[in-house]
Amino acid sequence: METFLGILIPFLGTTFGAACVFFMKKSLGDLVQCALAGFAAGVMAAASVWSLLIPAIEQSEGMGKLSFLPASIGFWVGVLFLLMLDRLISHLHVGSNQAEGPKSKLGSTTMMVLAVTLHNIPEGMAVGVMYAGFLAGNAQITAASALALSLGIAIQNFPEGAIISMPLQAEGESKGKAFFGGVLSGVVEPIGAVLTLLAAQLVIPALPYFLSFAAGAMLYVVVEELIPEMSQGKHSNIGTIFFAVGFSVMMTLDVALG
């Protein structure tokens, strides 16, 4: 039950965020969008470092001066994996009119949801890897540290859900469809976590690689998607401040609970 709830928490964050469409005005202001994107970026960056990369290096201490190697390899594989998906799947970032990936006849709404869904894959994997390590009895991964990561991702998923559903409504979609689009973007997270847990026999022996893989993929999303979003327009300073807030929140969660 503890693992089930831990896997579900990030998805609930997306769902609650998407529900903002029912009680907020039709569109988010530029300042709010910059703040939300900055906060999400800060949480993801801190989670990548404190919850994933540092544990990956610590678990490789037996390699001595080469303890950085598994983390470096996994990190790069994660970055390249997301880069490959970006090239293979048509998608549209929030606030952009230029689609990325191969040419497609998909509507802008569908491609926008695809973009967030695509970038939620590593978050689901990160949660799955943490709980796989905890269930396997890894001394460096506790129930509290796994929960800290789940809570951190849920916190950053809340604004992410709103960033999807609110613009969809502003583009003419009904509140129900806009909410569904926001929720749909987060479905991949529990699916990714469950699939990772099912592959635990493969994951556990190579845990440092999988932890750093998730970190690399998440930081790719931060740099490629969220930082440009938080830096748009005249409110970039707000985005930077909320990046620091998000980073501090996630760092505190990880240290306090981990």
Annotate the PLM regions.
Residues 1-258:
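Intrinsically disordered, metal-sensing/regulatory segments
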